[in-house]
Protein backbone atom coordinates (compact mmCIF):
# COMPACT_ATOMS: atom_id res chain seq x y z
CA UNK A 1 0.00 0.00 0.00
CA UNK A 2 2.84 2.37 0.77
CA UNK A 3 4.19 1.94 -2.75
CA UNK A 4 0.89 3.16 -4.17
CA UNK A 5 1.04 6.38 -2.19
CA UNK A 6 2.28 9.51 -3.91
CA UNK A 7 5.61 10.63 -2.41
CA UNK A 8 5.66 14.09 -0.85
CA UNK A 9 9.40 14.72 -0.88
CA UNK A 10 12.37 13.95 -3.07
CA UNK A 11 13.67 11.61 -0.39
CA UNK A 12 10.46 9.58 -0.43
CA UNK A 13 10.53 9.58 -4.23
CA UNK A 14 14.06 8.19 -4.27
CA UNK A 15 13.12 5.61 -1.67
CA UNK A 16 10.12 4.60 -3.76
CA UNK A 17 12.27 4.23 -6.89
CA UNK A 18 14.89 2.27 -5.00
CA UNK A 19 12.26 -0.12 -3.64
CA UNK A 20 10.85 -0.67 -7.10
CA UNK A 21 14.34 -1.31 -8.44
CA UNK A 22 14.89 -4.11 -5.96
CA UNK A 23 11.72 -5.84 -7.11
CA UNK A 24 11.81 -5.12 -10.82
CA UNK A 25 11.52 -8.72 -12.00
CA UNK A 26 8.34 -10.07 -10.42
CA UNK A 27 7.71 -12.52 -13.24
CA UNK A 28 10.61 -14.78 -12.36
CA UNK A 29 10.44 -14.21 -8.63
CA UNK A 30 14.19 -13.53 -8.56
CA UNK A 31 15.85 -10.59 -6.92
CA UNK A 32 19.19 -10.26 -8.68
CA UNK A 33 20.26 -7.34 -6.54
CA UNK A 34 20.15 -9.36 -3.35
CA UNK A 35 21.67 -12.33 -5.15
CA UNK A 36 24.67 -10.15 -5.90
CA UNK A 37 24.82 -8.90 -2.34
CA UNK A 38 24.69 -12.42 -0.93
CA UNK A 39 27.51 -13.52 -3.19
CA UNK A 40 29.64 -10.64 -1.90
CA UNK A 41 28.90 -11.67 1.68
CA UNK A 42 29.89 -15.22 0.82
CA UNK A 43 33.21 -13.93 -0.52
CA UNK A 44 33.90 -12.04 2.71
CA UNK A 45 33.05 -15.13 4.74
CA UNK A 46 35.32 -17.26 2.58
CA UNK A 47 38.30 -14.93 3.10
CA UNK A 48 38.44 -15.97 6.74
CA UNK A 49 38.56 -19.68 6.02
CA UNK A 50 40.92 -19.41 3.04
CA UNK A 51 43.72 -17.95 5.16
CA UNK A 52 43.39 -20.76 7.69
CA UNK A 53 45.86 -23.47 6.71
CA UNK A 54 43.85 -26.06 8.61
CA UNK A 55 40.56 -25.21 6.93
CA UNK A 56 40.70 -28.05 4.43
CA UNK A 57 39.91 -28.34 0.76
CA UNK A 58 36.15 -27.91 1.22
CA UNK A 59 36.43 -24.36 2.53
CA UNK A 60 38.98 -23.48 -0.14
CA UNK A 61 36.57 -24.77 -2.75
CA UNK A 62 33.89 -22.57 -1.15
CA UNK A 63 36.25 -19.63 -1.61
CA UNK A 64 36.58 -20.34 -5.33
CA UNK A 65 32.88 -21.07 -5.73
CA UNK A 66 31.91 -17.76 -4.18
CA UNK A 67 34.13 -15.89 -6.61
CA UNK A 68 32.75 -17.81 -9.55
CA UNK A 69 29.22 -17.01 -8.41
CA UNK A 70 30.01 -13.36 -7.86
CA UNK A 71 31.61 -12.74 -11.24
CA UNK A 72 29.07 -14.79 -13.13
CA UNK A 73 26.27 -12.67 -11.69
CA UNK A 74 28.32 -9.55 -12.33
CA UNK A 75 28.97 -10.50 -15.93
CA UNK A 76 25.38 -11.48 -16.63
CA UNK A 77 23.67 -8.58 -14.92
CA UNK A 78 26.55 -6.09 -14.64
CA UNK A 79 26.41 -4.21 -11.34
CA UNK A 80 23.52 -3.54 -9.02
CA UNK A 81 23.38 0.02 -10.35
CA UNK A 82 22.01 -1.34 -13.60
CA UNK A 83 18.93 -2.58 -11.78
CA UNK A 84 18.10 0.96 -10.77
CA UNK A 85 17.46 1.79 -14.42
CA UNK A 86 15.55 -1.25 -15.67
CA UNK A 87 12.31 -0.62 -13.81
CA UNK A 88 11.77 2.70 -15.61
CA UNK A 89 10.49 0.96 -18.71
CA UNK A 90 9.43 -2.63 -18.18
CA UNK A 91 8.24 -2.71 -21.76
CA UNK A 92 11.87 -2.92 -22.86
CA UNK A 93 12.44 -6.27 -21.27
CA UNK A 94 14.85 -7.36 -24.00
CA UNK A 95 17.79 -7.16 -21.64
CA UNK A 96 20.92 -8.53 -23.29
CA UNK A 97 22.16 -10.76 -20.49
CA UNK A 98 22.07 -13.63 -22.98
CA UNK A 99 24.67 -11.92 -25.15
CA UNK A 100 27.46 -14.39 -26.06
CA UNK A 101 30.08 -11.72 -25.35
CA UNK A 102 28.88 -11.31 -21.78
CA UNK A 103 28.74 -15.05 -21.24
CA UNK A 104 32.23 -15.35 -22.67
CA UNK A 105 33.51 -12.71 -20.25
CA UNK A 106 31.98 -14.70 -17.40
CA UNK A 107 33.76 -17.87 -18.52
CA UNK A 108 37.07 -16.04 -18.89
CA UNK A 109 36.70 -14.56 -15.41
CA UNK A 110 36.10 -18.01 -13.92
CA UNK A 111 39.16 -19.43 -15.70
CA UNK A 112 41.37 -16.60 -14.46
CA UNK A 113 39.97 -16.98 -10.96
CA UNK A 114 40.90 -20.65 -11.06
CA UNK A 115 44.46 -19.66 -11.96
CA UNK A 116 44.46 -17.13 -9.14
CA UNK A 117 43.27 -19.66 -6.60
CA UNK A 118 45.88 -22.20 -7.64
CA UNK A 119 48.59 -19.53 -7.54
CA UNK A 120 47.66 -18.48 -4.03
CA UNK A 121 47.50 -22.07 -2.79
CA UNK A 122 50.90 -22.92 -4.27
CA UNK A 123 52.49 -19.74 -2.94
CA UNK A 124 51.16 -20.24 0.58
CA UNK A 125 52.04 -23.93 0.47
CA UNK A 126 55.62 -23.17 -0.54
CA UNK A 127 56.00 -20.68 2.30
CA UNK A 128 54.34 -23.00 4.78
CA UNK A 129 56.69 -25.90 3.99
CA UNK A 130 59.56 -23.92 5.48
CA UNK A 131 58.43 -24.67 9.03
CA UNK A 132 59.72 -28.22 8.63
CA UNK A 133 63.31 -27.02 8.21
CA UNK A 134 65.56 -27.78 11.15
CA UNK A 135 67.66 -24.65 11.49
CA UNK A 136 66.66 -21.02 11.36
CA UNK A 137 69.32 -20.14 8.78
CA UNK A 138 68.09 -22.82 6.42
CA UNK A 139 64.55 -21.60 6.91
CA UNK A 140 65.50 -18.00 6.12
CA UNK A 141 67.38 -18.95 2.94
CA UNK A 142 64.59 -21.17 1.78
CA UNK A 143 61.94 -18.57 2.48
CA UNK A 144 63.86 -16.00 0.47
CA UNK A 145 63.97 -18.37 -2.48
CA UNK A 146 60.30 -19.18 -2.10
CA UNK A 147 59.42 -15.50 -1.86
CA UNK A 148 61.32 -14.76 -5.07
CA UNK A 149 59.52 -17.60 -6.80
CA UNK A 150 56.21 -16.34 -5.45
CA UNK A 151 56.86 -12.84 -6.80
CA UNK A 152 57.37 -14.32 -10.26
CA UNK A 153 54.09 -16.19 -9.96
CA UNK A 154 52.23 -13.07 -8.97
CA UNK A 155 53.88 -11.04 -11.74
CA UNK A 156 52.55 -13.53 -14.26
CA UNK A 157 49.17 -13.37 -12.61
CA UNK A 158 49.10 -9.57 -12.76
CA UNK A 159 49.75 -9.73 -16.50
CA UNK A 160 46.90 -12.19 -16.91
CA UNK A 161 44.65 -9.92 -14.88
CA UNK A 162 45.51 -6.94 -17.06
CA UNK A 163 44.67 -8.90 -20.21
CA UNK A 164 41.41 -10.01 -18.64
CA UNK A 165 40.40 -6.47 -17.70
CA UNK A 166 41.16 -5.20 -21.20
CA UNK A 167 39.03 -7.97 -22.68
CA UNK A 168 36.26 -7.29 -20.19
CA UNK A 169 36.31 -3.58 -21.05
CA UNK A 170 36.16 -4.46 -24.75
CA UNK A 171 33.11 -6.66 -24.21
CA UNK A 172 31.39 -3.88 -22.31
CA UNK A 173 32.08 -1.30 -25.01
CA UNK A 174 30.69 -3.65 -27.63
CA UNK A 175 27.61 -4.29 -25.54
CA UNK A 176 24.56 -2.46 -26.86
CA UNK A 177 22.84 -1.26 -23.71
CA UNK A 178 19.06 -1.09 -23.68
CA UNK A 179 19.30 2.37 -22.18
CA UNK A 180 21.79 4.35 -24.22
CA UNK A 181 21.99 7.18 -21.70
CA UNK A 182 23.32 4.80 -19.04
CA UNK A 183 25.72 2.82 -21.23
CA UNK A 184 28.86 4.80 -20.35
CA UNK A 185 27.97 4.78 -16.65
CA UNK A 186 27.47 1.02 -16.69
CA UNK A 187 30.81 0.49 -18.42
CA UNK A 188 32.73 2.63 -15.93
CA UNK A 189 30.98 1.25 -12.86
CA UNK A 190 31.32 -2.37 -13.94
CA UNK A 191 34.97 -1.96 -14.91
CA UNK A 192 35.96 -0.36 -11.60
CA UNK A 193 33.95 -2.85 -9.55
CA UNK A 194 35.32 -5.81 -11.46
CA UNK A 195 38.93 -4.62 -11.27
CA UNK A 196 38.84 -3.79 -7.56
CA UNK A 197 37.20 -7.07 -6.63
CA UNK A 198 39.69 -9.04 -8.70
CA UNK A 199 42.83 -7.48 -7.22
CA UNK A 200 41.57 -7.37 -3.63
CA UNK A 201 42.28 -11.05 -2.85
CA UNK A 202 45.85 -10.60 -4.08
CA UNK A 203 46.42 -7.78 -1.62
CA UNK A 204 44.81 -9.60 1.28
CA UNK A 205 46.92 -12.73 0.71
CA UNK A 206 50.22 -11.33 -0.55
CA UNK A 207 50.71 -8.57 2.03
CA UNK A 208 50.53 -10.83 5.12
CA UNK A 209 52.91 -13.32 3.51
CA UNK A 210 55.51 -10.62 2.81
CA UNK A 211 55.20 -9.32 6.36
CA UNK A 212 55.68 -12.80 7.81
CA UNK A 213 58.80 -13.35 5.72
CA UNK A 214 60.15 -9.89 6.59
CA UNK A 215 59.74 -10.62 10.28
CA UNK A 216 62.45 -13.32 10.11
CA UNK A 217 65.23 -10.77 9.82
CA UNK A 218 64.03 -8.66 12.75
CA UNK A 219 64.21 -8.98 16.50
CA UNK A 220 61.43 -10.47 18.60
CA UNK A 221 59.63 -7.18 19.17
CA UNK A 222 59.48 -6.25 15.49
CA UNK A 223 58.64 -9.82 14.58
CA UNK A 224 55.56 -9.76 16.82
CA UNK A 225 54.56 -6.35 15.43
CA UNK A 226 54.85 -7.50 11.80
CA UNK A 227 52.97 -10.69 12.53
CA UNK A 228 50.12 -8.83 14.21
CA UNK A 229 50.01 -6.41 11.29
CA UNK A 230 49.66 -9.32 8.89
CA UNK A 231 46.81 -10.70 10.98
CA UNK A 232 45.06 -7.31 10.95
CA UNK A 233 45.33 -7.15 7.15
CA UNK A 234 43.76 -10.57 6.94
CA UNK A 235 40.89 -9.49 9.20
CA UNK A 236 40.31 -6.37 7.09
Positions of PLM-derived features:
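Extramembranous, membrane-proximal N-terminal regions and early juxtamembrane loops
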Residues: 1-236
